[in-house]
């Protein structure tokens, strides 16, 4: 079975190989964003208080519960988010956005089958709902069903060509199947659409490493740590890239930064020792 590339051109066969290892570094598995809806509100106490007032004054309004549930979800208050989405769909069983939002909470909490059911319901109600297509694609990717995931990511991109997360997740899918040039193309598009998140830079850097382009990888990981200086994976992966380039100074400095974030990080400890790092010594990182 083959998967078709996103643009007209040759058919891309993706070998269904489990757990592609990338030159001693692990593939990025997270998502840089969480399929935010349009007009999503920031997860601030003031917004929660305001939305709780709206819910109190409109106890039968499913949109009020959906909006508050979205803010709870952004704040990591998953149980409260779930309760609000449950209420929203009980008030309006045809409320596709609430099903999609509840699917996101289920996915974040590892309940992939429940997430899949909610995304399916949302897409039954609106087959062109890009957010639900993206969310379902991520679930399929996590469930190691790459063909289904590929179709959903393509659908999400066809509906919303400006959706950085859809390109990022399709890139992860290509990467997991060792189709690194296609992965690099998708990560590049994601970076062009949103330049303030480290994960696409890390992911593209890993694919560059997999094709032995450590100079390009180091450049991406420079950007990753600039965007997110507290990102442990960015520092560790950057250190490995510079280690492979023979720049022990920057490698040691990057491993040291990783160890400052997590002194027990085994890969960083081993890498720091490999490049002759000494605790308490200062290193140039840039």
Model regions: which residues?
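N-terminal leader/linker segments that initiate helical-solenoid repeat arrays
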Residues: 2, 6-7, 19-83, 90, ...
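Terminal, low-structured helical/coil segments at or just beyond the last alpha-helical repeat
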Residues: 3, 26-36, 42, 236, ...
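Structural signature of tandem alpha-helical TPR/SEL1-like repeats
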Residues: 41-50, 76-87, 109-121, 143-155, ...
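Helix-start (N-cap) detector for alpha-helical repeat units in TPR-like alpha-solenoids
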Residues: 62-63, 96-97, 130-131, 164-165, ...
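A generic tandem-repeat structural signature
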Residues: 93-176
């Amino acid at each position: 079975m083959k998967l078709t590339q996103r643009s007209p051109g040759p058919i891309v066969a993706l070998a269904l190989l489990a757990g592609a290892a990338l030159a001693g570094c692990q593939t990025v598995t997270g998502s840089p964003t969480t399929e935010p809806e349009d007009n999503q509100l920031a997860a601030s106490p003031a917004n929660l208080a305001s939305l709780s007032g709206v819910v109190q004054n409109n106890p039968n309004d499913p949109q009020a519960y959906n909006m508050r549930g979205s803010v709870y979800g952004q704040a990591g208050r998953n149980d409260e988010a779930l309760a609000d989405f449950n209420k929203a769909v009980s008030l309006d069983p045809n409320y596709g956005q609430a099903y999609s939002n509840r699917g996101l909470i289920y996915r974040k909490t590892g309940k992939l089958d429940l997430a899949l059911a909610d995304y399916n319901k949302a897409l039954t109600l609106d087959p062109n709902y890009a957010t639900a297509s993206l969310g379902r694609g991520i679930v399929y990717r996590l469930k190691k069903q790459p063909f289904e995931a590929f179709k959903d990511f393509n659908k999400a991109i066809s509906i919303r060509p400006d959706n950085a997360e859809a390109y990022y997740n399709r890139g992860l899918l290509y990467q997991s199947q060792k189709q690194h040039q296609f992965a690099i193309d998708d990560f590049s598009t994601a970076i062009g659409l949103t330049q303030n998140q480290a994960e696409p830079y890390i992911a593209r850097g890993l694919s560059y490493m997999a094709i032995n382009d450590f100079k390009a990888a180091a450049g991406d990981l420079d950007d990753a740590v600039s965007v997110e200086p507290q990102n442990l994976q960015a520092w560790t992966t950057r250190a490995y890239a510079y280690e492979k380039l023979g720049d022990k100074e920057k490698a040691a400095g990057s491993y040291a930064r990783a160890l400052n974030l997590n002194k027990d990080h085994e890969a960083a400890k081993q890498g720091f020792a490999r490049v002759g790092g000494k605790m308490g010594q200062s290193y140039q990182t840039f």
